[in-house]
Amino acid sequence: IWSGKVLGVSGWLGAFEVEWQQENPIDLEICTRCNGCVRACPEGAIDFSYQIDLDKCKAHRECVKACGAIGAVDFARAATARKENFDLVLDLSREPLIRLHDAPQGYLAPGDDPLEQALAVHKLLGLVGEFTKPRFTQYRERICAHGRSGKTGCTQCLDVCSTGAIRADGDHVRVEPHLCTGCGGCATVCPSGAMTYAYPRMPDLGMRLKTMLATYLEAGGHDACILVHDAEAGRDQLRALGRRAGFGERGLGRKGAGRGLPARAIPFECFHIASIGMDFLLGAVAYGASQVRVLATGREAEGYVAALREQMSFANTILHGLGYEGEHFAVIEAQALEQALWQLAPARTVGKPATFNLSADKRTSLDFAFDFFFKDTTKKTQEIDLPPGAPFGALTVNKDTCTLCKACIGACPEAALLDSPEAPQLRFIERNCVQCGLCVTTCPEDAIRLVPRLLLTAQAKEPVTLNEAEPFNCVRCGKPFGTKKMVDNMTGRLGTHSMFATGGALKRLQMCGECRVIDMASSKNEPSILDYTGRK
């Protein structure tokens, strides 16, 4: 038993670390409950809780003498911070010590309600033993657009995670699998596909979706509406809706009875609704669905629902741009579920269901979907404008300010920006761009701007030249080593500096790397390290 003021709690089931400040001189872990200090205290400042009332204490220290060699009473201990590890944590504070929407498993904070406290204690009894959990996500740092060279780009997964399982780790992110609860929100918002949903896998969800819709269409169904719900609160909501159908809300007969689900509404259970991203949404319509509605029960973190609505906004914009009328994707609140489904007008469907399968690589699945819709529709739109934040788009480069320093090429994690071995060129493959903005923040000339859009032609997969310049040849050997604009800019800025005012230092900036070394070694006017020998 320890006492004191808790400073912080971290960790997860079986590995919590609690740090606290010892506020009372008596250490309950060492105390033997001999009552010697209680009898010795002349002010009666110690009761049978074996904690000293410091307002009554007059510092006689008789309790210290009474405790003797046991050493449980130490007035110098109060200033010491302590740490210990615990398997489970029951937090009875008025305000939880861990302020997360989804707290770690094994941490319970029932508040000050006695019933909730009793239920929490009962739940703790079931958290004893050995447990296994899947690793819900896979992370490929090579294509992660979080950062490069200390510059921050994409922070989507960090912003959406409600468990604190994802943290920045230099130019990449680090996922703590013990804290991850498998919502899949990080994989949904990840623009590059660096974060993928490993359990359950998207190919498995896609195959289940494809089979379900194929069976429905073969049976003569039409205008299918996929109703996505989670395996807990969402499932309970649908069961309650079914029980209420035909019997009224109070069980008093058919008058005022609920209607249940429309025949075209097909429930689709997933682990968590945050895992439903653009690949699933567009895949459902490509497989023959008219619409997808996702049931939000109110238990989800607000950030997940907001991210889901944003993904739906991107997907709706793309389908509208291709001529598919109607609202294909939306979130339905639990209290309005029945009414919203019955009032829902069907949206336009595809002519013939797609045959491709959803892949674990989100960008690949989306490429398949875009190609399919472009071939299926009669509106052959080649370019669709997208709202800011979309994971597709182009770049514009200000050719007047760009010096082709190529810093943006080194910063791009998706190989969307390329160099040319033949000439000073900045080339761009639009299909690879995820609009992370690293090129914008890295550019020293502030010459790059993002253009969110979706290009549906073959040009999106081909390199295009954004800027090119006249090469600059070394004034000593004639070898090209940069652009004329870059060298002129460099000499113009450094020409007035004292280090380049004398000798051939300024001219040396117009030489390639090898010639600079040769020129410095052969010049008699340049100071040598030997010139400084013996100086203090």
Residue ranges and their predicted role:
Residues 422-427:
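A cross-kingdom feature marking solvent-exposed beta-strand/loop segments within repeated
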Residues 170-211, 293, 306-311, 328-334:
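Terminal amphipathic helices with adjacent charged low-complexity linkers/tails
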Residues 189, 196-203, 441, 445, ...:
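Catalytic cores of secreted or luminal carbohydrate-active enzymes
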Residues 1-160, 164, 223-238, 249, ...:
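Ferredoxin-type iron-sulfur electron-transfer modules and their immediate structural context
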Residues 59, 65-68, 156-173, 177-184, ...:
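Cys/His-rich finger/ribbon microdomains and the adjacent scaffold used
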Residues 192, 197-247, 259-264, 270-290, ...:
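Charged, low-complexity interaction segments
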Residues 104-108, 213, 241-246, 301, ...:
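Short secondary-structure boundary/capping segments
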